[in-house]
């Protein structure tokens, strides 16, 4: 019986040495084909539970089948895999390919997945599958593991999707201006944050005439940071990701344009209210408004004259100030806490009401 053990790079021998203390007899390969973070273990017994006792182990895949690393032979394993997937179950194929071959991970996912589907009549579900077929491709050998979908699932039906809120959020960011290299660095952080939260739009909004070249460097940084995060998202998510639109508009004109049509204007500033004091009303408005405009300052805060036009002025962390690059993550995480927390409270109230109506 073989197991593929995944660790942080450089921890492979630590795992092996710890395993020797709790398992009497096993064979192992450290960093197969030179790929760090992998240990392949073979034992006469099922030692998965013992392997998981080692803190340095991040993941264990029990090998169900192995074959030579040949596209047709890998796909033909569907004949064996079908016995582990029922017609009324859903499944997904996840391939991790190491090294150069004449096929891609996507090729395996598509063709093997299609053959399993034909053989089982099971449905493919890339988000919440009942079973996951893991295909681990090395230079000469390929291993297949089958796990319950929830075992390593990031996205479960029980978890609210934060995109419910963030897809309605427009970030209005005052640009960081000054030394050009610093402008660019701050721009990168802003671009990464806006793309990371997949907001509806990022508006770069200077409040007055500014140095064109300083602004240009800031915007260059935004683009670099945004695309850097976007490339990671494309690899990490099992669904399509879009680039967040980035525009430039005068700060005061943004306020004029957005003060209508069922929109919510929020300014983050130390002069505002604590979230705990406004969270109930804010949660209601976050749900009802079609668009949420969040204003973030830079070296200077949002001009005080605009406070009159905001629906909320929020102090995210009383007696503390955030660095420019932390404003977007701090604001959005705080708003998500308010938005999702309202659901939990409503759920609790509903459960309590139901219990009372049942005479409990």
Curated annotation (Swiss-Prot):
Residues covered by the THUMP domain? 45-148
Q: Which SMART domains match?
A: THUMP (SM00981)
Instruction: Tell me where on the tree of life, at the top rank, the source sits.
Output: Archaea
One short Pfam name that applies is THUMP
Database matches in Gene3D superfamilies: 3.30.2130.30
Task: Provide a Gene Ontology MF annotation, just one.
Answer: RNA binding
A GO biological-process term: tRNA methylation
Against InterPro entries, the record matches this protein to:
Alpha/beta_knot_MTases, MJ0421-like_THUMP, SPOUT_MTase_fused_to_THUMP, THUMP_dom, tRNA_sulfurtransferase_ThiI
Q: Which residues form the signal peptide?
A: none
Q: What is this protein called?
A: Uncharacterized protein MJ0421
């Amino acid at each position: 019986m073989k197991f593929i053990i995944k660790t942080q790079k450089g921890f492979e021998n630590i795992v092996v040495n710890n395993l020797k203390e709790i398992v009497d007899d096993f064979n192992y390969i450290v960093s197969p084909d030179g790929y760090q973070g992998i240990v392949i273990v073979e034992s006469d017994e099922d030692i998965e539970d013992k392997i998981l006792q080692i803190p340095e182990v991040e993941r264990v895949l029990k090998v169900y089948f192995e074959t030579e690393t040949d596209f047709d032979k890998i796909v033909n394993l569907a004949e064996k895999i079908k016995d582990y997937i029922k017609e009324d179950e859903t499944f997904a194929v996840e391939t991790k390919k190491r090294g150069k071959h004449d096929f891609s991970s996507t090729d395996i996912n598509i063709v093997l997945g299609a053959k399993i589907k034909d053989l089982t009549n099971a449905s493919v579900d890339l988000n919440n599958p009942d079973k996951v077929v893991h295909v681990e491709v090395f230079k000469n050998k390929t291993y297949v593991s089958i796990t319950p979908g929830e075992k390593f699932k990031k996205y479960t039906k029980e978890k609210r999707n934060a995109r419910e809120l963030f897809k309605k959020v427009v970030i209005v960011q005052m640009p960081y201006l000054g030394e050009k290299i610093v402008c660019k660095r701050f721009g990168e952080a802003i671009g990464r944050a806006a793309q990371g939260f997949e907001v509806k739009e990022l508006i770069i909004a200077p409040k007055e005439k500014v140095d064109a070249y300083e602004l240009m460097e800031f915007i260059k940084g935004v683009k670099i940071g945004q695309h850097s995060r976007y490339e990671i998202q494309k690899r990490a998510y099992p669904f399509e990701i879009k680039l967040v639109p980035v525009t430039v508009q005068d700060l005061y004109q943004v306020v004029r344009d957005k003060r209508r049509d069922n929109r919510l204007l929020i300014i983050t500033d130390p002069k505002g209210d604590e979230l705990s004091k406004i969270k109930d009303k804010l949660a209601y408005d976050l749900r009802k408004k079609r668009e949420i405009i969040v204003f973030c300052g830079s070296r200077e805060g949002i001009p005080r004259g605009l406070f009159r036009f905001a629906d909320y002025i929020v102090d995210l962390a009383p007696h503390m100030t955030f660095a420019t690059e932390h404003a977007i993550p701090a604001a959005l995480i705080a708003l998500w806490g308010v938005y999702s927390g309202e659901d939990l409270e409503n759920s609790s109230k509903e459960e309590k009401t139901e219990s009372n109506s049942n005479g409990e």
